[in-house]
Amino acid sequence: MRLVETIVSGMAGRYATALFELAEEAGSTDAVAADLDRLKGLIAESADLERLVKSPVFTAEEQVKAVGAVLAAAGITGIAANFVKLVAQNRRLFALPSMFDAFAALVAAKRGQTVAKVTVAEPLNDAHQAALKEALAQQTGKDVSLDVTVDPSILGGLIVKLGSRMVDASLKTKLNSIRHAMKEVR
């Protein structure tokens, strides 16, 4: 069993694996990763682009045309651009965020790193990020990079997902636990 098969799975994993292998052959893994990160940021910033990615209403031709224009405007070319256009042509844009995550996991594994998905109520400052990275690195024995998402609905604390493990130290979860405990007392 190849290392790639143990890191990613499903449709998004297959697409990400194909992209990773192409990028490896071309020696442009870092450039492709940077292009995908830029596109991921554009999708997060634009409600219209997010709607294009997630909505099944648009035809494949409309998606390819729109994505092509976005890629050209963002200066994303080569392997990454061709990959995203192929995904649009195959009507799989809805899975693009999962493909980004799977590709990032493959790149991190190649570098001997692991990616921790961290959800926080407010942005972490540099000192907190460094402390969290250090604590996770001690637990895993690997270099850890953080994928931080801000979600005010967790109220406080944080949620850390690292591989198949998850630690939920959010205030929302603690309050829900207290609420359930109080219901049982009645």
From Swiss-Prot:
One of its GO terms (cellular component) is plasma membrane. This is ATP synthase subunit delta. Its main location: membrane. It is a peripheral membrane protein. The keyword rRNA processing does not apply. It is found in: Cell inner membrane. F-type ATPases have 2 components, F(1) - the catalytic core - and F(0) - the membrane proton channel. F(1) has five subunits: alpha(3), beta(3), gamma(1), delta(1), epsilon(1). F(0) has three main subunits: a(1), b(2) and c(10-14). The alpha and beta chains form an alternating ring which encloses part of the gamma chain. F(1) is attached to F(0) by a central stalk formed by the gamma and epsilon chains, while a peripheral stalk is formed by the delta and b chains. Keywords: ATP synthesis, Cell inner membrane, Cell membrane, CF(1), Hydrogen ion transport, Ion transport, Membrane, Transport. GO terms for molecular function: proton-transporting ATP synthase activity, rotational mechanism. It comes from the Bacteria. HAMAP family: ATP_synth_delta_bact. PROSITE patterns: ATPASE_DELTA. PANTHER family: ATP SYNTHASE DELTA CHAIN. F(1)F(0) ATP synthase produces ATP from ADP in the presence of a proton or sodium gradient. F-type ATPases consist of two structural domains, F(1) containing the extramembraneous catalytic core and F(0) containing the membrane proton channel, linked together by a central stalk and a peripheral stalk. During catalysis, ATP synthesis in the catalytic domain of F(1) is coupled via a rotary mechanism of the central stalk subunits to proton translocation. The keyword DNA-binding does not apply. Belongs to the ATPase delta chain family.
